[in-house]
């Protein structure tokens, strides 16, 4: 047998919350919401930038599979997760998660198909700028 021991450190956050007054918890939640609102613009800029990276990288789709190419699409996709919701685009956040799943599936199965990725990226652009539908 191993000498390894499993330890469960005390959950200090849970203890602090359970000992805090409801007023203190409400103040913390209000501050957290204000902080998210303060970074929403920067998150929207990040979303715009990463969508541009996706669109640009997608235009360079190679004829044959290339090591690292799908990673050049996966990395900006995964960086949209969370940031899109904070920017006020929760559906774009879900689409980014879905795109990561699509890319992962293509990668895992050694498939080389542009269309599923292109459709996701186009849909994500419309989720960011729905007024483009006219």
Which residue stretches match the model-derived regions?
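Alpha-solenoid HEAT/Armadillo repeat architecture
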Residues: 59, 63, 82-85, 129
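Short, mixed-charge, low-aromatic patches
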Residues: 3-12, 50-58, 74-81, 100
């Amino acid at each position: 047998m191993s000498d390894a021991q499993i330890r469960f450190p005390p959950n200090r956050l849970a203890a602090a919350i359970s000992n805090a007054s409801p007023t203190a918890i409400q103040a913390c939640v209000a501050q957290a919401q204000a902080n998210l609102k303060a970074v929403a613009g920067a998150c929207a800029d990040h979303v715009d930038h990463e969508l541009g990276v996706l669109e640009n990288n997608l235009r360079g789709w190679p004829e044959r599979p290339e090591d690292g190419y799908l990673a050049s699409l996966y990395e900006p996709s995964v960086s949209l997760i969370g940031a899109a919701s904070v920017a006020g685009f929760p559906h774009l956040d879900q689409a980014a998660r879905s795109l990561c799943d699509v890319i992962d599936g293509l990668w895992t199965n050694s498939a080389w198909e542009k269309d599923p990725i292109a459709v996701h990226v186009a849909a994500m652009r419309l989720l960011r700028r729905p007024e483009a539908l006219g």
